[in-house]
Amino acid sequence: MTKEEILALMKEKGKADALDLRSRAKDLDGTALIAEESKIPQFDPTKDYSTWAVGSPVYEIVDGERQVFTLITPHNASYYPGSTPSNTRALWSLKHTKDAAKAKPWVSPLGTSGMYDTDEVCTYNGHVWRSKKGGNPYEPGAVGTDDWWEDVGI
């Protein structure tokens, strides 16, 4: 096989994996999606997401780290110049994991999008933090958040 043929097969496999995950995504939580993160496509600001199912995942690089978002409202991204999942939370929901080994850097919730549920984790200031309560909008380690976050210390 030539390099071009191998590359074509790899692209075909990647597309098939992404479509398979997208078909199952509505039934998966953030932990399950992030476990299959390698199958999630990068957000494309020129793409028409209006035919995608609610819950379909994309990733975006936020502050140098990959963050996973799921579609809330199907739309054509090209109609919203400059929009990304991280700055259009009415259209995309930030996902989190309960797996400390796959914890993502803390990102501030916007409205209800991105709030941390019970046992979801994030990294912050070199530590892994676990949310003690659902609907957690607070920054880990901030004054007065002891009832909301546990420093796992990993």
Positions of predicted regions on the chain:
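Tryptophan-rich substrate-binding surfaces of secreted polymer-degrading and adhesive proteins
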Residues: 2-154
